[in-house]
Amino acid sequence: MSTELWTTPSAYADAFSTATLNSIASGNSILSDLALTNTNGDIFCDVSFNLASASFLAPNFIGIFIYPLNKDTSTYGDGRFGTSAAGIPSGYPGISVGITPTTAAQSGTVSRLLLPAMGCGYKFVLYNGGGVTFASSANTCQYRSYNRAVV
């Protein structure tokens, strides 16, 4: 009988440059400035974020989405959110993470997001549903990828 296991994940790497996540208004999304390629052929990724202290209010969640590189090899997803803009990505893989409505730093991790096929480019999009503009510094978001193994 086979057993399904997870492979050892890669080390965490930046999903966004730190400055990209600074001062994002509540209700806005931002496309990562870092282009990623699934050259390892990994199937899953975990995404972890740390937000500097702010007075977070309801609605209180962070959304994380994956925009694939389109056939034109220059546009990701629907082409929105190259700069911070109002709205939530629709029609693309994503997940939300609840955050506490309080004045404090916030952290969260989502697990097992499906990655695009091997060799395909993609970027992450982060949605601020925290009810307040992000702090002007010290916001970070990283990811790691991995596969499953059947032994």
Task: Name what the model sees in each region.
Residues 41-51, 61-69, 116-141:
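Internal, hydrophobic beta-strand segments that form the core of beta-sheet-rich folds
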Residues 1-43, 48:
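Solvent-exposed, flexible loop/coil segments flanking beta-strands in beta-rich domains
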Residues 67-106:
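Terminal beta-strand-rich extracellular "head" domains
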Residues 95-122, 126-131:
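Beta-sandwich interaction modules
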Residues 60-65, 78-87, 110-113, 137-141:
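"Short basic amphipathic alpha-helical interaction patches in structured regions
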Residues 1-15, 118-120, 127-151:
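C-terminal interaction-tip segments
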Residues 37, 48-52, 100, 111-113, ...:
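A structural detector for beta-sheet-dominated domains
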Residues 54-58:
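Short consensus segments that form the blades of beta-propeller domains
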